Structures are given as structure tokens and as C-alpha cells.
Amino acid sequence: QPENLPPQLPFFLFIYPEFRLRGGWKGTAELLRADFEEKIQVVHKKDLKNRADYARITTLYTSLVLRARQPGDRFRPAGRGLSKPLRKWMNEAGVPNELRDTLPLLASGSEILWVCGEGFADGLAPDTESRWILHLDAEIETQEEKTNEYAR
């Protein structure tokens, strides 16, 4: 697998709707309109935790980057009402050791706003006032997907 990818990517939704990060991760970022139809659709629980109020994120946080963990990172898990070191959260959540150094994160400085597989931090979920919803998702690219990508 090519590891010549940058250690982090500036998060510009309209420039990078699809992204690749070290460790074989491939992801997507979408901006969804929060209209009536969106709210009444049956949405998978996994998708809900990967959605956040776009205006809230872009108003409260600057210099967003997609990256892996760094020393000093902190995360506020949704519904827990507290912030804790990302390292400690990963231990408690049972994140496999082999994924911890490459797991995709959306960060602003040392504050982690989204963790792949866990979702967005506390206070970022869309609500009835949300007009635009950010949807992030990522997974490890399979060997077959890599082969198909390079064959194009």
C-alpha cells in the first residue's frame, strides 16, 4: 500500500469529498440538506453518529484537518458530558492497538471532533435548527478496491 500520503489533510469539503489517509483508509465527506424529507427518512444508526451540524462545526472550529492521533489529543464522546484524553478513550472503547495510530479523525488543534467508528463529539449532533448536515465516513480499503483503483 502506498504510504506516501500526507500525515494530515486540511479539511475542505468541496475540494476533498473523498479522501485517503495513511493505513489504507478511504473516506467520504458529504454535505446534506437538512430538509423535511431527510428528517423522516429511515436512517441507519451508524449514519446518525457520523452526522453533525455543519454550521456549528465551521462556526466554532477553525483549521479543521483529517489526520490520525497525536500526543495531547482530547475527545468528548457524545452523551458523556466530559472530555478525556483520546488515548484513554481508545483504551476504554477497546479500539484495537493496530488501528490506533491510523484511525481517521477530524480535528481542530488537539480537540477531536470526529472519530471513525465512534462518530462526532458531544454537542455537534444535528437538531431541528440544523440547515446543513456534515456526513463523514471511512473504512479500510480492501485489496480488491486498491487493484480496481489502479487499473483505471
Please identify what each model-predicted range represents.
Residues 1-152:
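AMP-forming adenylation/ATP pyrophosphatase catalytic core
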